[in-house]
Amino acid sequence: MKRLREMGLMALALALVALAGCGHDAKQARLMVIITPSLDNPFFGQEAAGAEAKARELGYQTLKFSHGDDAFKQSELIDTAIARNASAIILDNAGAQSSVAAVQKARNVGIPVFLIDREIAARGIATAQIVSNNYQGAMLGAQAFAQAMGEKGPYVELVGKESDTNAAIRSKGFHEVLDQYPDLRMTARQSANWSQSEAFTKVQSILQAHPEIKGVIAGNDTMAMGAIAALQGAGRGDVAVVGFDGSNDVRDAISGGKAAATVLQPAWRQAQYAVELADKYLREGKTGQAEKLIMDCLLITRANAARLSNFALK
């Protein structure tokens, strides 16, 4: 009997140790996985940095990944997040259509996904979709571009990736304004896939075919910087350039007279707000907000460029 009692006490002690271990795990910081198209691109890098800073401030562990606009790699990274038992995923996705299945996969196992910058072509799958008011921002940029062009002359439009809804929305916003000016004439419209090197090469070619151009309006700042490099190399510093994002590079180009304007979309704030909503959802089971949330953009010109730093106006 004494032996049985000792064995029972030992089993109870082991059970208590196991429970204590579970309690310790429960107190450990939960994991927030942050996935963006790139960690090297300044815009996406600031998204990741902003999300990471806020998540750590709120007590979460973090993992940062980039999918390189590859939907298959994005799906693999979602699998990694699932395998690591992530509490939530902050995602700037790899395509409106091609990302739906990946977001649904996370949802199916109970991991909420909070989208930033780019929306997907479905509702009710992501817990939140926090995007810039791309149409409003594009109209701001186009108005500044028209003014920089003196409301007349031939111009070029550089468009982003066709799979990214932001590219089409920004282009429509540009033309909502520019098409109202009868003396503005678009001589070329090409996709440079958000790439600085592609924009550089394409503007070089466009200059050979259309040396008369007076302006370049670009769907993001990376392409704008490629255009500026090509224009400067050709001795065409007289060509007006307007970008979209609010990067430090284009800020400096504006201050140096190499660009007319850019449009600031609040990358840092979007990412931090996504983490705040994720934390609220994990604590309360709801965000208290609509799924799609839109943040207005701001025009950056020489008048306020000095206040711009890391995609935020100080």
Residue ranges with predicted function:
Residues 1-31, 104-111, 314:
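Short, low-complexity disordered leader/linker segments with a strong preference
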Residues 31-54, 58, 62-80, 84-86, ...:
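Extracytoplasmic "Venus flytrap"
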Residues 43-57, 137-141, 165-184, 198, ...:
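Short, solvent-exposed amphipathic alpha-helices that sit
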Residues 61, 97-136, 144-147, 154, ...:
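Flexible loop/hinge segments that line or gate small-molecule binding clefts
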Residues 74, 130-155, 169, 198-200, ...:
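Hydrophobic alpha-helical segments within soluble ligand-binding/sensing domains
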Residues 91-107, 174, 192-252:
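Hydrophobic alpha-helical
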Residues 158, 162-166, 177-178, 269-314:
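Hinge/cleft segment of the Venus flytrap/periplasmic-binding protein
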